[in-house]
Amino acid sequence: MEILSVFDAEFKKYGRVLEGLDVTELLSELEKTEKPDGVVYKPSEPEFEKLTVFDVIKNNVYGGMPIQIGYCNGTNTKLNCVEYHRDSEINIVLQDTVFLLGLQSDLDNYTLKTETIKAFKAPAGSSVELFATALHYAPCDAKKGDGFRVAVVLPRSTNTDKPEIKPICEEDKLLFAKNKWLIAHKDTSEAENGAFVGLIGENIDIKDLI
């Protein structure tokens, strides 16, 4: 596996780098948040949502839809799972960060061969949109031991409690939280906690590439 850049042409299938957003204040607030040895995710951080950029992203990027800005911080080098939402996700990175990405079009009966996963590095301070069709999960370190802090923008209430549903189609078995469809590798805590197991092949680890 090669680690590509979000500025490479290959990334256009997965997302785009957003230009024109002033995220200076957001990055300052993000720097104050925790960065554990594992991975922590908080869907909504009130301090982020008081900032001017909150309304700019809500109106300019999401066209006025209700949004939340939270964070995903920690240290990680593995794929473990992929997820998708019904909309784009914006990731604003404090430091160089790697994303392991797949495509919904590569799914076969909601299974995915991990050999189809690509790695892309986003530079510090960049704002990266991942399209709704991009399969993704926790960010990865770009340099061994450095960890990451990433502000995560999604429609309001995404990744909160799973709705109670009566299954009507195969995709329903993937629903893991609100607006979150999850596909796990068998060797993960998510699989142990009932996530649909559909990643086929090696659980990718980039520790020897960084």
Predicted regions and their residues:
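Tight coil/turn sites that cap or link beta-strands
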Residues: 124-127, 133
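Active-site region of the double-stranded beta-helix
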Residues: 1-124, 137-210
